Amino acid sequence: MSQTITLIKDKILSDNYFTLRNITYDLTRRNGEVIRHKREVYDRGNGATILLYNSTKKTVLLVRQFRVATWVNGNQDGMLIETCAGLLDNDEPEVCIRKEAIEETGYDVGEVRKIFELYMSPGGVTELIHFFIAEYHDSERASIGGGVEDEEIEVLELPFSRALEMVRSGEIRDGKTVLLLNYLQTSHLMD
């Protein structure tokens, strides 16, 4: 017998920016036992992220920006170094990530390649992130980047080896960024 889930109650606790819901459900275990659970679930929509790399120059493009959740959790200045990313907002993942790449980094890249999609914090957050990589070239620079009006984003072009060192030293602590840098390393695209 497989597990079955029965929704008992779905109550919205807050929908000011994203949606925080209180979910009550019964989980019927494989042995037939029914257990009632009550959990809060944060729904912020799905997202996409991309690591831009240049195999000739052996560099990657990352961004540095303020992330309030990290500040609340002890990151003194709230600044985080990460891959370009954004919420889908009803766009297809590739459409979203192309827009975000131009807005944040200023690069209008050619071919993008989807690597995988992952739940980053499935214990309480619904978000599914689509992961991409793309090679960038200086000729594809369309603007200075930096994000939209309410964002202040610094574009960082780093040697790939330096980015990997920054993961080890704790200067890069964003999960999606670490995953994509490790993917780039193990795929040997920078060899």
From Swiss-Prot:
The lineage of its organism: Bacteria, Pseudomonadati, Pseudomonadota, Gammaproteobacteria, Enterobacterales. InterPro entries: NDP_pyrophosphatase, NUDIX_hydrolase-like_dom_sf, NUDIX_hydrolase_dom. Mg(2+) 1 binds at A85, E104. In the dimer, the N-terminal domains are swapped between the two monomers, such that residues of both chains contribute to the active site. Mg(2+) 2 binds at E100, E104, E151. Homodimer. Its cofactor is Mg(2+). GO terms for biological process: nucleoside phosphate metabolic process; ribose phosphate metabolic process. This is GDP-mannose pyrophosphatase. Keywords: Hydrolase, Magnesium, Metal-binding. One of its GO terms (cellular component) is cytosol. CDD domains: NUDIX_GDPMK (cd24157).
